[in-house]
């Protein structure tokens, strides 16, 4: 992936950059792997806002991505690398020998025409999925299962990868991008390599309208609201929040307060917390 930097010929292109999409080999998605995606605008089934700052955005169709990699010991050919509006990573279209087609996350350096497979005996090549117990120490992996057979749940964002650092008993120890070190069951599957499109983090939107295209609405500071709208609101002119520490719109501690639930079932898996 390359980054296209725009000249400042309008205010909207000043400091603007975007992907050059040089790695995209096919523009039209596979129709059999599309699903309807309804815009929720942050509302739940009762119409109550449960996620703020969501709404609008370009109409999208969901691409059904295979996170489980449960088609074992059957080789597939990479037919194309495609854009997915629902995530920052690219997706790869696979054509299996038995005729089935599936999408997977496109790892770095995966090219059209490459052969990929999943299973305990799959070779240690980029894009192949194996149990963590069969992957050597020091290998970079992504799309990692937390429970065997549930499908990949972590390390799916563009440019991310985890490293296998130890194996002991029924667990494999991973170092995550957040510097957290945690254990995962050795039967869990993971995909070899790093997720592609690593330059995504260096993009600059350049104008508010591009945020709106993504379905993200403005975030208003609580200190500029009225007292009835936020605990930080009110006062004459530019006044402070009037509290010892910042809080959320509902009065809960914010900015630095740990939000992980105490005594969570997976606490025993975490060796070192993220920084």
Swiss-Prot record:
Gene Ontology MF: a single term: transferase activity
Signal peptide start-end: none
GO cellular component terms given for this protein: chloroplast; mitochondrial large ribosomal subunit
Region (Disordered): 1-28, 227-251
Biased composition (Polar residues): 10-22
Keyword terms of this UniProt record: Chloroplast, Plastid, Ribonucleoprotein, Ribosomal protein
Compartment(s) of residence: Plastid, Chloroplast
InterPro entries (alphabetical): NA-bd_OB-fold (IPR012340), Rib_uL2_dom2 (IPR014722), Ribosomal_uL2 (IPR002171), Ribosomal_uL2_bac/org-type (IPR005880), Ribosomal_uL2_C (IPR022669), Ribosomal_uL2_CS (IPR022671), Ribosomal_uL2_dom3 (IPR014726), Ribosomal_uL2_RNA-bd_dom (IPR022666)
GO BP terms in the entry: mitochondrial translation
Subunit-level organization: Part of the 50S ribosomal subunit.
Family: Belongs to the universal ribosomal protein uL2 family.
PANTHER family, A to Z: LARGE RIBOSOMAL SUBUNIT PROTEIN UL2M, RIBOSOMAL PROTEIN L2
Protein name per Swiss-Prot or TrEMBL: Large ribosomal subunit protein uL2c
Organism: Rhodomonas salina (Cryptomonas salina)
